[in-house]
Amino acid sequence: MQQFPLYKQHDSMLCGITCLRMVCKHFGVSYSAEFLSSLCIEGREGISLLALSKGSTRIGLKNECGLVGITEIQNILPCILHWNQNHFVVLYKVKKGKTFYIADPAKGLVKYNLEEFKKHWVSTQSGGEEKGIAMFLEPTPAFYEKKMDEEPKEERSFKFLFGYIKQYLKYYNAIKFNGMDINLENSIVNYIESICK
């Protein structure tokens, strides 16, 4: 079996985007993390499952998300899992219902036995069954027919850098620039946003 494509996240906020990127590559289409980030609206805590769902739909992936049992996740692989209640990983293979193969954008390709897997993934019990959150993805013909054009590299890189910096601005009220206090929210952010439009 061919090894599952692995990309590493460059930041703790990009685990969901990186998982979506790995699934796209598995299905035969390559996208940059920057481009996928532009399709998925980030929140303060990173990318939500809803944002991943909307972004994947825009590139032609049919998706279903929900609380499911361990038996159900083995039927449609690969799938994106909500892991440790604060991270996303891709489950790409299950061997005999006992060994679970994970593409973790923070750790790499990892395998877990059933008990270890449940410890990381299970978030609740419903009807006597242990369940966790999963997103199932399936390519539609549109996914293969028309790969969405990515923006020119220079512009894409600038937008990605701005998006990356913007999420950390909440930690700073002001900066010193040539001896003057400049309020980031009012000056730099507004200028950069006007360039990115």
Provide a role label for each language-model segment:
Residues N173-K197:
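Transmembrane helix-loop-helix hairpins at lipid-water interfaces of multipass membrane proteins
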Residues I17-C19, C40-I47, S53, I73-N84, ...:
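Noncatalytic regulatory segments and standalone regulatory/sensor domains
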Residues Y31, K93, N190-E193:
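Aromatic-residue detector
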